[in-house]
């Protein structure tokens, strides 16, 4: 599937600015550069900044869609991406994940204690970057700070909820509350920050935030589908990888509401993957998960239709929605 315009158009300026921000030297800078893919642990060149860069791309898109200039949005876009990466470093510690994008995680290379410091440092860099949006009026700059901090807090709340779901039969409502915060908060923040950079009023900013939160749910639920039924040749992970990690994702929450006895299987060691997959199929979880992601894509499309975006932006956003709901990785 072709990469949508929104994820192509802004990648180069975002990467260039990220590389400029990540010039910190010393042990802390070394960990930043390693995590972001700029260098390996031995100091040799890394694979480069990876990932979709969805959040910072949405900041830039949201600004331009309202007639704003990308230069006003870039510092905020980079700030949001750094917040996201602060959360990834800490999530890897909490989830005991040893690999990220095919490379050992920061805590596996540098130890848990130093990885915590690296995450904290990225958060500070993020806040510093958000102050570099010098073309914004003081009122809008303050609004951007409040928006970023509020979304970061809600994202952390979501991580707390995510950890609390482990080992118990949480249902769909609890899952959605968690995902709306853990994933939706930063994606909502992305569209709102872009609106701030373009000078949007509070009413419009609220609509942008709501759109992003719905988009975040669609993104996360599709991610959950891929984490269980994704093609290993595309994802680089085995079928059922999220199940093997004991992750309480949407498919599991949906299935548990229909087959509570599944909880006993989920607790077994060694993990009975084939039987769990069979139970998920029997509850209709696979189809329901795909349908739930499509539901939120339709809701996002409805909200976007009412926004005062330029015509090209509505086309580009529709392309992004199709990509997110059908993507395989």
Which functions belong to the PLM regions below?
Residues 58, 126, 158, 252, ...:
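Residue-level signal for inorganic ion chemistry
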Residues 47, 100-123, 169-183, 206-210, ...:
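Divalent-cation-assisted or electrostatically stabilized phosphate/pyrophosphate-binding catalytic cores
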Residues 130-149, 259, 286:
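Transmembrane helix-loop-helix
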Residues 1-83, 89, 93-108, 160-169, ...:
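Conserved N-terminal diphosphate/IPP-binding helix and adjacent helical/loop segment
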Residues 73-97, 149-154, 184-188, 192-195, ...:
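Active-site alpha-helical segments that house and flank conserved acidic catalytic motifs
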Residues 276-329:
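C-terminal charged capping/lid subdomain of soluble metabolic enzymes
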Residues 60-64, 127-132, 192, 196, ...:
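Short glycine/serine- and small hydrophobic-enriched flexible loop segments
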Residues 113, 117, 151, 155-159:
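Mid-bilayer segments of alpha-helical transmembrane spans in multi-pass integral membrane proteins
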């Amino acid at each position: 599937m072709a990469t949508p315009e929104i994820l192509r158009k802004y990648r180069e300026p975002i990467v260039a600015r990220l590389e400029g921000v990540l010039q910190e030297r010393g042990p802390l800078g070394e960990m930043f550069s390693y995590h972001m893919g700029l260098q390996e642990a031995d100091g040799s060149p890394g694979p480069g900044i990876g990932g979709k860069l969805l959040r910072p791309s949405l900041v830039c898109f949201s600004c331009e869609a309202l007639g704003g200039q990308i230069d006003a949005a870039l510092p905020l876009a980079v700030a949001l991406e750094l917040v996201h990466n602060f959360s990834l470093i800490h999530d890897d510690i909490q989830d005991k994940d040893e690999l990220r994008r095919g490379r050992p995680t920061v805590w596996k290379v540098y130890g848990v204690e130093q990885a915590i410091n690296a995450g904290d440092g990225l958060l500070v860099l993020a806040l510093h970057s958000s102050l570099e949006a010098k073309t914004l009026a003081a009122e809008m700059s303050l609004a951007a700070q409040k928006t970023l901090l509020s979304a970061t807090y809600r994202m952390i709340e979501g991580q707390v909820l995510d950890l609390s779901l482990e080992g118990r039969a949480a249902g769909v409502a609890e899952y959605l509350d968690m995902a709306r915060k853990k994933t939706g908060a930063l994606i909502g923040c992305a569209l709102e920050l872009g609106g701030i950079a373009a000078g949007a009023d509070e009413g419009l900013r609220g609509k942008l935030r709501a759109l992003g939160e719905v988009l975040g749910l669609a993104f996360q639920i599709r991610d959950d589908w891929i984490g269980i039924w994704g093609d290993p040749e595309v994802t680089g992970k085995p079928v059922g990888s999220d199940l093997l990690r004991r992750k309480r994702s949407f498919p599991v929450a949906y299935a548990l509401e229909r087959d509570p006895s599944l909880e006993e299987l989920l607790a077994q060691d060694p993990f009975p993957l084939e039987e769990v997959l069979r139970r998920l199929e029997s509850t209709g979880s696979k189809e329901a998960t795909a349908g739930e992601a499509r539901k939120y894509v339709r809701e996002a499309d409805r909200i976007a239709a009412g926004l005062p975006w330029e015509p090209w932006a509505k086309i580009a956003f529709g392309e992004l929605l199709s990509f997110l709901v059908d993507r395989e990785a």
